Amino acid sequence: MSRFTGPRLKIMRALGVDLPGLSRKTIASRPTPPGQHGAKLVRRRKSDFGIKLQEKQKLRFNYGLSERQLRHLMLNARKSTEPTGETLLQLLERRLDNVVFRAGFAPTVIAARQLVSHRHVRLNGKPVNIPSIRLNVGDEITIKPESLNLPIVLGTLQDLPLSRPEWLLWDEKDKTGKITHLPTAEDVPFPIDVQQVVEYYANRM
């Protein structure tokens, strides 16, 4: 399954949750699923599979991943000695495109990925163009000086979509973000039952 390119608010309404990495819009004004029978769908109890699928889709869409990419991260998480769900969330939060987003350089993860792909981002002082790079404690990101004047960067820095997480130390003068410790499940900026995601993949790998 490829990355979805349709209306982002429609996705969030279907999942019943705001996904800050996907869109700055909110479902507050239209909380029911899209479609003629949206209100009835809210009242209908989801099956166990439906719940697992919904939680998995939250991760896919917030972090802008294809099914193949998320499955690959789950495989890596299962190799860890730490709880699989916690490890999966940590791997997602440590992706370069997400860190660029959480630092406040872009309004969404998708926009952050574009900045990385076009080499506007520096990692430890060097230009990079691979959004999936996994950052570690001590890594530092910034935007090239000439790219700080891009409207999307300027606008986001002036109106942050989210508060910066505690694991990312921000230097306002130099416009840099440094990872001081690894993210935890509590740092994920939307409600997620990651154990449901683990169970979804349990018999699919």
UniProtKB/Swiss-Prot annotation:
The keyword Transport belongs to this UniProt entry's keyword annotation: no
Top-level taxon: Bacteria
GO molecular function, one term: rRNA binding
CDD domains for the chain: S4
S4 RNA-binding domain span: 94-157
InterPro entries cross-referenced by the UniProt entry: Ribosomal_uS4 (IPR022801), Ribosomal_uS4_bac-type (IPR005709), Ribosomal_uS4_CS (IPR018079), Ribosomal_uS4_N (IPR001912), S4_RNA-bd (IPR002942), S4_RNA-bd_sf (IPR036986)
Keyword rRNA-binding: yes
Any one Pfam family match given in the protein's UniProt record, by short name: Ribosomal_S4
Matches recorded under SUPFAM superfamilies: Alpha-L RNA-binding motif
Subunit structure: Part of the 30S ribosomal subunit. Contacts protein S5. The interaction surface between S4 and S5 is involved in control of translational fidelity.
Stated family: Belongs to the universal ribosomal protein uS4 family.
Function: One of the primary rRNA binding proteins, it binds directly to 16S rRNA where it nucleates assembly of the body of the 30S subunit. With S5 and S12 plays an important role in translational accuracy.
Name listed for the protein in its UniProt record: Small ribosomal subunit protein uS4B
Species name: Nitrosomonas europaea (strain ATCC 19718 / CIP 103999 / KCTC 2705 / NBRC 14298)
